[in-house]
Amino acid sequence: MTKAPHPPSAHPPSAHPPDVLPVTAESAESAGPSVVADVPASTAIVDPTAAAGYITRICFKTGPPRRIGVELEWTVHYRDQPARPLDPADLATALGGHAPRTLRPTSPHDPLPHGGLVTVEPGGQVEISTPPTESLTTLHQVASADVVALTRRLDRAGLRLGRTGCDPFRPPRQILRNRRYTAMAAAFARQGRAGADMMCGTAGLQVCLDTGSDRQLSLRWSAAHLLGPPLIALFANSPTRAGRRTGWASSRMATWLTLDPVRTAAPADPTAGVRPADPVADWTRRVLDTPPLFVDEPTGWRLPGPATFGEWIRTGTPRPPTYADLDLHLSTMFPPVRPRGYLELRYLDAQPDGEWIVPAAVLAALFARDETLRTATSTVMDAADRWLPAARDGLADPVVAAAAHSLAELACERLTDTGLPDETTSTVVRALRRRLHQRTYPWGGTR
């Protein structure tokens, strides 16, 4: 449900902009006509083939892999009373002109000094979406500077950023109630409390990578999934929620994986091969085989029945879906890896105190060369289906731990491909080895 950074792919001027897909509430509610093939958003979809073509053009834009972006998300707390419920007025005051319009409708929503855009989630979590860069070093510099700017603004208002992937102090509480968030809360409430936990009490780190060329697509798509379980375990950072230990290394991923599996879980068969026949077809099929979470009507949001989006196209009842409906549906698909014209890796917990660079560097190193990525995927096949064990047990799961060790060692060997300076590289290596050999989480606990 979070917003991805500015698209990390460089495309020729004729390419359709990757950010036409609305992801956040503000973009979903203000999206104008679709720009894909000049199809007006209000055009009815009467043929599943047309929908499939649209999904392909929106979600898979191929080209040389060059750029990387991150989204950094945190829970927000009062510095001296971290368990105190957050007042949205205090958060809006702290953010000033950087506040999104979902929080302050009259805000200019200015970017931070180095270009990062601030958004706010339903529970008051704050996130920075970075501009894409062709250099991990540049990304580290600009994102770190924007984090400092954000931290200073919050500090002046008596607020601070959280350090884990779940709110360790407070139960989930929705403080933003626009149309999209209200509809999403109602839809997920039909399946229990996990929706509220996800919307209002979690914080993640998203790393966005180019899809790659047509030739690279299958490898990069498969690798993004196959690396998931060991990286979840290696960077698990949410063992506590609302004042109690949950028994999960990553309570955040436990919530996501079980929330609405057709929409949020990993692919049913992640071991279908390092080179799946057609990731575009697989994703398109999943989108069309998933029911809409909610539908936007002139009279307000409507919660539909169990019919899938593909069935809605075929029946055309109570009205045919439009491309605006399909855009909205795509924005409510929340799998661990989401194609948005680039690959959005969504399975990492928020990291504390600038340590987001560690998982970002690992992924950048592994994805820098196809040969490295092939080696990486070949070492993790035994753990490929262990999403839930990775989230629950972290590095205490021996199969996942073995895969994590292999990935970390390979990444350390290939960090030179990231262009990071020696000092940062040394920091990354030390952090990885500390977690692997001491089995420690960033918050200092052990498993």
Could you describe each region identified by the protein language model?
Residues 162-333, 337-338:
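Loop-rich catalytic cores of soluble enzymes, especially ATP-dependent carboxylate-amine ligases
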Residues 304-385:
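Long, well-ordered mid-to-C-terminal structural blocks that present hydrophobic/aromatic surfaces
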Residues 128, 286, 344-346:
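Short, aliphatic-rich beta-strand segments
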Residues 75, 206-208, 344-346:
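Structured core elements
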Residues 2-11, 19-24, 32-193, 201, ...:
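Terminal catalytic/cofactor-binding subdomain
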Residues 130, 209-211, 347-349:
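Short glycine-centered, acidic/aromatic-flanked micro-motifs in structured strand/loop junctions
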